[in-house]
């Protein structure tokens, strides 16, 4: 048997992992500006944490979850999304307590798992970056969170992004709309896809965002949620729209957008961009005011979003956006002869302890091969260390770009390489 990675997974190799680290670091920097702190939850949860919150009839639960019984006969699932685990953690750790500052703002990063047909930007193990804000029903929280997502996408370089906005209203408005949708779709049931015929019975709002051609035709003249909003829901949505306009955030009202999770109410949104003629959602989220109470906590408002790292990187690549990845070595030490082996090890370690990114040769190769390695690593400076340099205590440090050279002592390199580095035209942080 040939041992390979499971279908729908990937190995993120060093050339790619640098991009991942950049995206994750960039997200952390943006989130910190908005006073978010990181939370890390287990990658597996009790089955009910996901099924009851995401919705028993959703595609995620009925078709896509990886679930199993462990050796203690506990029903476990690999997390398919990030919000439910964070809410579970919020309640379990009593972060709703009076002494905890409100609103409570958290972000998370990590792998999620869904049994889907693998395709570009969508894998069975995928990685999500997300945020959750607890304790504020103020529509300004909706807008701040959406604006933070827009801020991140703009700063990282995603082009042509459009914000699609909708509301699901409060439970009363949603229930009224649900019935109106059932009344509209029931006579058309036989024209719907098999999945949407099932959805009509279980979760009729999901028919609205079906990608099947026959379903799109069926919902063309469907009633709009906007016609079923009560005063509270209308006031909240109007405030969100007005504040987005005040911040200069453009949006498109998309009444067919419902999101694939049952816990949403009021504001929902997606950031969408077009790649090769296809609309791709790069970030999505919304408000979920009933989820904390559903997990046994007090009535607590919530708002958040998630974005897929694989899809984000795919879009950046397709749009030709080069991330500013700094992979260059500061110093490469070419080693000539066994007599220089120990000193080279001491020297490269001293450089690293001074904060420089340094490497040396370990393979006793010819100098030409070592110089080629220095070029492959894009080394800024090059030191050639042989037995004669060890004996004299003097060595040549070369600017590997301009070929400028300086003669210095090994002691100076070991103790204060910054001075030499700057003399050769480079700057230390």
Curated annotation (Swiss-Prot):
Keyword entries, A-Z: Aminoacyl-tRNA synthetase, ATP-binding, Cytoplasm, Ligase, Nucleotide-binding, Protein biosynthesis
EC number: 6.1.1.21
A Pfam match: tRNA-synt_His
InterPro entries to which the protein is assigned, alphabetical: aa-tRNA-synth_II (IPR006195), aa-tRNA-synth_II/BPL/LPL (IPR045864), Anticodon-bd (IPR004154), Anticodon-bd_dom_sf (IPR036621), His-tRNA-ligase (IPR015807), HisRS-like_core (IPR041715), HisRS/HisZ (IPR004516), HisRS_anticodon (IPR033656)
Protein's cellular compartments: Cytoplasm
Principal location class: cytoplasm
Gene Ontology molecular function terms on file: ATP binding; catalytic activity, acting on a protein; histidine-tRNA ligase activity; transferase activity
GO terms (BP aspect): histidyl-tRNA aminoacylation
GO cellular component: cytoplasm
Catalytic activities: tRNA(His) + L-histidine + ATP = L-histidyl-tRNA(His) + AMP + diphosphate + H(+)
Family affiliation: Belongs to the class-II aminoacyl-tRNA synthetase family.
Self-association and partners: Homodimer.
Protein name: Histidine--tRNA ligase
Source species of the chain: Streptococcus pneumoniae (strain ATCC BAA-255 / R6)
Gene from which the chain derives: hisS
């Amino acid at each position: 048997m040939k041992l390979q990675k499971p279908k729908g997974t990937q190995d993120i190799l060093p050339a790619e992992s640098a991009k991942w680290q950049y995206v994750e670091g960039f997200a952390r920097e943006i989130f910190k500006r908005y006073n978010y702190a990181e939370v890390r939850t287990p990658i597996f949860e009790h089955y009910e944490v996901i099924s009851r919150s995401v919705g028993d009839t959703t595609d995620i639960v009925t078709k896509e979850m990886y679930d199993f019984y462990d050796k203690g006969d506990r029903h476990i699932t690999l997390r398919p999304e990030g919000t439910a685990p964070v809410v579970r953690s919020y309640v379990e750790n009593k972060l709703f307590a009076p002494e905890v500052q409100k609103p409570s703002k958290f972000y998370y990063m990590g792998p999620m798992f869904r049994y889907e047909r693998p395709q570009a930007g969508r894998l069975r193990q995928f990685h999500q970056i997300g945020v959750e804000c607890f304790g504020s029903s103020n529509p300004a929280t909706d807008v701040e969170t959406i604006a933070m997502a827009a801020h991140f996408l703009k700063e990282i370089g995603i082009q042509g992004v459009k914000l699609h906005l909708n509301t699901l209203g409060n439970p009363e408005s949603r229930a009224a709309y649900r019935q109106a949708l059932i009344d509209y779709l029931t006579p058309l049931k036989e024209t719907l896809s098999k999945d949407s015929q099932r959805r009509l019975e279980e979760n009729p709002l999901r028919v609205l965002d079906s990608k099947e051609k026959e379903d799109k035709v069926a919902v063309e003249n469907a009633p709009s949620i906007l016609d079923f909003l009560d005063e509270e829901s209308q006031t909240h949505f109007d405030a969100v729209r007005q504040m987005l306009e005040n911040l200069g955030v453009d949006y498109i009202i998309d009444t067919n957008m419902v999101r694939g999770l049952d816990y949403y109410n009021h504001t929902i949104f997606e950031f969408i961009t077009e790649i090769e003629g296809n609309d791709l959602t790069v970030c999505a989220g919304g408000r979920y005011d009933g989820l904390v109470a559903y997990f046994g906590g007090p009535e607590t408002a919530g708002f958040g979003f998630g974005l897929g790292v694989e899809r984000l990187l795919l879009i950046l690549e397709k749009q030709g956006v080069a991330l500013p990845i700094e992979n260059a070595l500061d110093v490469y030490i070419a080693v000539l002869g066994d007599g220089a082996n120990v000193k080279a090890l001491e020297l490269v370690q001293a450089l690293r302890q001074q904060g420089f990114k340094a490497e040396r040769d370990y393979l006793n190769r010819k100098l030409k091969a070592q110089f080629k390695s220095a070029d492959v690593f894009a080394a800024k400076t090059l030191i050639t260390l042989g037995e004669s340099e060890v004996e004299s205590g003097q060595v040549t440090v070369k600017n590997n770009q301009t070929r400028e050279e300086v003669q210095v002592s090994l002691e100076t390199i070991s103790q204060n390489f910054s001075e030499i580095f700057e003399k050769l035209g480079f700057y230390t942080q």
